[in-house]
């Protein structure tokens, strides 16, 4: 049962990440950075949650993306190579979109982190 759930999370995360990438490929003046940011943050959560499920941890028992990420660090310390704390919007409760979704450059950073986490999860 969890395998299907994990596969669905990865599939949904990939679709959302692809949409964010497509948005960023538009001319910069046409990019809706808030849309990219929100989609990418949901992607981060999906991939992190999929990793936890792969490791028999129910992500719903953890209150935030940060708590889930920190649990990933306990399971696999190499997650520290992917530093989601560098995102200005992250705090102990998760993402505050109003603090971050202002420029294409910043949402591009978030997209890169989501890609790195996807790679880590798929390869694990």
What are the language-model segments listed below?
Residues 1-124:
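Terminal alpha-helical segments
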């Amino acid at each position: 049962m969890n395998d299907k759930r994990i596969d669905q999370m990865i599939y949904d995360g990939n679709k959302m990440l692809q949409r964010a990438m497509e948005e960023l490929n538009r001319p910069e003046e046409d990019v809706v950075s808030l849309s990219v940011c929100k989609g990418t943050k949901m992607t981060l959560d999906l991939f992190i949650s999929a990793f936890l499920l792969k490791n028999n941890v129910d992500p719903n028992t953890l209150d935030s993306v940060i708590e889930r990420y920190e649990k990933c660090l306990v399971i696999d310390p190499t997650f520290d190579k992917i530093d989601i704390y560098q995102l200005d919007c992250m705090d102990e409760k998760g993402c505050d979109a109003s603090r971050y979704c202002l420029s294409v450059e910043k949402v591009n950073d978030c997209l890169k982190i989501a890609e790195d986490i996807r790679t880590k999860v798929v390869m694990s």
